[in-house]
Amino acid sequence: MVHHDPIGLIAPNTGLAQLNERSRDIFRQIVESYLATGEPVGSRNISRLITMPLSPASVRNVMSDLEQLGLIYAPHTSAGRLPTEFGLRFFVDALMQVGDLTETERQSIQTQLASVGKAQSVEAALDQALTRLSGLTRAAAVVLTAKSNVRLKHIEFVRLEPEKALVVLVAEDGQVENRVLTLPSGVPASALTEASNFLNARIRGRTLAEARLELETALTQSKAELDQLTQKVIAAGIASWSGGDSDDRQLIVRGHANLLEDLHALEDLERVRLLFDDLETKRGVIDLLGRAERADGVRIFIGSENKLFSLSGSSTIIAPYNDGAGHIVGVLGVIGPTRLNYARVIPMVDYAARIVSQMLGG
């Protein structure tokens, strides 16, 4: 399933629904030429490309109509035409046929992930998935994963100073997270040991969110058995896991260099520079990708439909992936110029998300 944003962008009263076959054919050729070359295309070339015999003058008349509908425009540097963002959205929604992946492409993604199926961490597997996805699409690949969905294995307190300790949290997939914890005054080594034992008896196999709920309940029920300082250490440990929602999200970006390929002008280089700046805005990228967690299937944002990348004129194609229980635990996809090969990239993102879901499901 493919979701387009924003829903309802193509209004039925715009006249687009009444485009005849000739107009659609000419518009399709303009878009496909742009996606292939990034260059404006003129009426003479269009008249050679379309299936029906039309003179360049007749093609120009149709192009004028398409321009009035807001589907194409004339850049100031050329007599040819390019699709507008609105035109690209119409093409993706109404005219484009999404193809199937070739067997070679499927095998390429499967093989890359199979090679890391026994990797030390899910993060390593996702990194490999992104490397393959960016290589196949020639765009930047991104993944947003929730650390809080990792299942816990072990916790340990290591005293650093009289009133500071390092909390070492080890996950079942091998990930290790360290946080510095401020200790209540006068905590003895025995209280740290007792707190570790109490926590380890209750967190194994649970996600961070599940562990928090379990421990808050268990702490209330076990107050009579624990001395006051140990209770404070446990409470401080739980609180340290709740700090900062951005820490619960992990963003990985691969394939920046792909965006530097096939640049046609200084204007293209400036767009890529702006996109690089956007990708460094971690909070914005996380917010964008987080939108895909609320729906199944592939979502497509073209140009200014996504405020984060509006200046760089970039498109984003993203899809959620699930864990073994069928819960959405992250989002992956690609970010690139608006002239992405949508028909090819959409099934790649969809397939990669499904393979990652299968891998996480065991």
UniProtKB/Swiss-Prot annotation:
Key word Transmembrane helix present: no
Gene3D superfamilies referenced in this protein's UniProt entry, alphabetically: 3.30.450.40, Heat-inducible transcription repressor hrca homolog, domain 3, Winged helix-like DNA-binding domain superfamily/Winged helix DNA-binding domain
Keyword Transmembrane: no
Molecular-function GO terms, alphabetical: DNA binding
Alphabetically ordered keywords of this record: Repressor, Stress response, Transcription, Transcription regulation
Any Pfam family matching the protein: HrcA
Annotated GO biological process: negative regulation of DNA-templated transcription
Domain of life: Bacteria
Task of the protein: Negative regulator of class I heat shock genes (grpE-dnaK-dnaJ and groELS operons). Prevents heat-shock induction of these operons.
Family named by the database record: Belongs to the HrcA family.
Name of the protein described by the UniProt record: Heat-inducible transcription repressor HrcA
Organism: Nitrobacter hamburgensis (strain DSM 10229 / NCIMB 13809 / X14)
Native organism taxonomy: Bacteria, Pseudomonadati, Pseudomonadota, Alphaproteobacteria, Hyphomicrobiales
